[in-house]
Amino acid sequence: MSQQLQQAVEIAYSSTAEPALKKQALEYVQNVKAGAGAAEVFVGYLGDAGTSDVGRFVALQALSELAGEGGPARLAFLKDSAMRALRGETGGVWGAPEYVRNKTAEWVSRLFYAMYGEVNGNMWNSFFEDVAQATGVAGLRGSAAVEYNAAGLDAFLRVCAAINSEIGDQTFVRSKDAQVKNNSLKDAMRVQDVATLTSIWRHALEAMRQDVQRQDVAVLVLQCIGSFISWIDINLIVNSEYISTIYAYLNYPKTRIACAQCLCEILSKKMKPGDKLQLLGMLSLTDKVLQLGDVEVEVHEQLAKLTSSVGLELSVILEQCHDDSSSAGSCSIANSADHQIIHQVAPLVLKFMNHEYDSVTQQTFPFISHYLTFLKRLFALGGKPGSAVALNSKKLPLDDDHRQFLTSLIIVCMNKMKFDETCSYDDEDEVEEFVETVRSKLKVFQDNIAVINPAIYMENISKHIKSLLLGNSWRDLELAIYQMHNFAESIRNNLFGLNKSAISQSQPAQLMTTFMQDILDNSAIFQSSNPLIQISFFELIVRHYNFISHTGKNDISILSIFCTPFSMFNDSEKVRLRSWYLFSRLIKVTKPRLDDESLSQLLSKLAPLLAVKLLPNVANDSEIDTTFDNQLYIFEGVGILIGAKAKEEYSILDGVLSPLFADLESCIAAPVKSPEIVVQAHHILMAIGTIARGVHAGLVPENQLNNPQVNAALVHKSLIEKFSNIAEVILVTFSYFNKYETIRDATRFSFARLTPILKNDIIPFSSRLISIFLESDLKTIEMNDFLGFLGQMVHTFHADDNCYQLFNNLFTPVIKKVFDLVAQVEQEGSLASGANTAPAVSKVANGKNVVITDSFRDKVQLKKAYYSFLQSFVSNNVTSLLLTTANRNILPLILSDLLSYTPAEIHETSSMKLSLNVLINFVKFFGTGRCADFKDRNANTFEPLEGLSEFFITKVVPLVFEIPFKPEYEFNIDDGSCLVLAADLSRLLKALYDVNGDPANNASLKYLTEAYFPQVQFPQELSMEFIQTLATADEKAFEKYFVSFIKRMRS
């Protein structure tokens, strides 16, 4: 059997074997595992002298799995086998590769998990004694001066580590039952064996201290102590002799990292402040680290982490004693802890923080962050007035020691913020990583110092920025700009604790203004070709433009900087595109009122960027023209400049639009509408619409954009004429390209941007626009957007008679277009199902047994847009449009749709809610055949629609009862969505009752009592109760009754 297993293992783990053969080999090994005598087979295979290391690993893997599955007899057999393996009698595991030794330890730990402690019936309570004897380390319980087996100690320690991974490792999420068992095993170990284990570890460390050959094993001991410390009695480890023994291993290169990690784990153990302070006093860490001198970076990382851990624990002691400042003992402990931080830990932390490798620097951040947070509670003079920091600070005078610490810290932060010599500015990943992991954290520390003592911050950052601006390196200039940004943000966020009214004239603000003046006059900045400097410069200018306004630089001089190769004409695409956005952003924020001459000169400089050029490989609709998307920012910025200019004369707009119009004419004249031509036409329409949006934004204050009176007062007649011409151009273009979806999108976009300027003057153009859209072959998503566009028009122009007439003429064609598209979507869904294709399907989230296809989802989205369109007539008091002579014939189609639903539609809650809301409002406003909306100016213009009242009654009443009670609708009143639906149905029935007047002659009540209830054989007593409640209860009370009624009837 062993020979067959060996062959199977060799094949299964071979890199050259055929896949089919490897599969057979793996199946053979699995079958052996599942066999009745698997334990005996794999123990025999493990002990076979011919078994390879990989074979031993497979055998041990199988035995580990079997240890968790067998009964007492199998466990006893496996226990004996494991002991023989640990004694080196079988399996050859002592001298095996590390992965085999680890797997052996895992096997033994699984036996521990299955047999140790009361939770396992005390099947193997002598586990650790037996393992210690088997591995030859039992003598280390009492003394270091004994002979021991180094390979056996290695095995013993790996077993200990495996056991901790099994029961003590907190990185794994375990079930509640597993956690209970783990806790029971740890309790048993604490009582019986932990003291023995800690003795063996300590004596092993003492025995190996001078044995360079065994330092690898010492690493295992230190790892065991570090991993067990979280759940064993701290007093077993924390005593001067034990800590000294561990501490000594900082002296040896091979053990430094493991020793530092072990000490960090010990330090993180929860203890009373006094006890923790005593432990920290044992370490004399500062002296030890200084003695080590130059070591590897990895060692420096661990030493930095260890130092930071010491500082963090001292800082925690400070915080705890500060919160319990009533006792003299707490004050004494706090003073001692702070003294250690300032005089011992801080100098070392700052040394590590200033290390050339960022990985070392980062280890110090937890301590620095915590300690600064504590210092804010004592000393903070800044912080926004009324903020938690300002209110909670004791505002104690800053002593010399803490002043020196804060000064040294901010200097180190500033030094470490600079990109080092190895960093290349064009390595975006490296730059981003440094900013996110190091620089951003240092900025927070810098800000905290500003809050604690604004004077220290001001003095040092001003020196730093001045020094950097004099530097020649791109690293100096980049950091200067970054620090200016930080300084400006500290003013914006009022880290200095100034009164709001005093900020603009404060010393920090004046200093920032000086810095802005300096950077605008700094020739080295503008001579730099570094993208980081170029982008960060303009980010600074735009973000903190308010400081420039006091420098004497006018708007046109700043905007002119953008119109140079340093910015918008830069060779670097990244800089160029970002500058386009920032140019627009600056204009949007400042809205400069330029005179015509200055604006004309600026537009002349920008002219090359105002031409729409089609880049190669973007003719395909699926391609994204990133350059053009960013170019739109320029068009918007130019529009704002034109809208905000000093004079109300807009001939300058022609200079921007004429080249675009000429290009559109070329597109229209092209005999073949190639993809390139279509894309160019789309881009030009988008540019025109974006310019229009910019003009409006420049003309009207941002907080008044939707105020009709303000808009009307600010829009000059000449501008309306310009925009009317734009509308005409767009319509002509659209008429030639209306079969292209991208053109339809761009047309709708542009038209919507003309509306705020043209107002009612856009209605004649809109009539033609809508007609062309209705002639187009629209996709579902386009129709959704188009209906939204129409709804917005109803909202904007509902009081305009021309708009009323427009929709009177076009309402019926729009409705027909919607239902034609609904029918098309349904047909596509049927064809897909009939052809046995696989449309995407998913169960609806409400748990109903309804399958939703893509076509059904498209239909639902279209219906929602359609219902919102109908609701716009209700919301804007023009429901009379549905009763005009032109639209009466389409009304039956509309109402039929609102009064009939499939089971799948019933469970689309959002769509149903919209639909029923429309139906409720229709019942309220023309449920009697006459328009009852007193706000509708045309309500009395038309004759009543005969028979409409009876139609509503005979259709609404059955609908209200069929939806909750018909089996095919699967209506579950306990489901939240169905509960919402029931509430809407109750409102519908109540609205029907209300519009039919006096209870004594109410046609809806009469239909219920004389026709519907008898027809469905409704009990007489319940009928009277229902009628009575409907007639007397208000809407809310009837809703509550109707829900309980459904529950009663379905129970």
UniProtKB/Swiss-Prot annotation:
User: What does the record list as GO biological process?
Assistant: tRNA processing; tRNA re-export from nucleus
Gene Ontology CC annotation, any one: nuclear pore
Sorted keywords for this record are: Cytoplasm, Nucleus, RNA-binding, Transport, tRNA processing, tRNA-binding
Is Cytoplasm among the key words of this record?
A: yes
Compartment(s) where it occurs, according to its Swiss-Prot or TrEMBL record: Nucleus; Cytoplasm
Q: Which domain of life is it from?
A: Eukaryota
Q: Which InterPro entries does the UniProt record give? A: ARM-like (IPR011989), ARM-type_fold (IPR016024), Exportin-1/Importin-b-like (IPR013598), Exportin-T_C (IPR045546), XPOT (IPR040017)
Give GO terms: molecular function aspect only. small GTPase binding; tRNA binding
- What disulfide bonds does the UniProt entry report for this chain? none
A Pfam family this protein belongs to? Answer: Exportin-T
Give the protein family.
Answer: Belongs to the exportin family.
Q: Relate the protein's function as given in its record.
A: tRNA nucleus export receptor which facilitates tRNA translocation across the nuclear pore complex. Involved in pre-tRNA splicing, probably by affecting the interaction of pre-tRNA with splicing endonuclease.
- The name of this protein is Exportin-T
Q: Which organism is it from?
A: Eremothecium gossypii (strain ATCC 10895 / CBS 109.51 / FGSC 9923 / NRRL Y-1056)
Lineage from the top down?
Eukaryota, Fungi, Dikarya, Ascomycota, Saccharomycotina
Q: Which gene encodes it?
A: LOS1
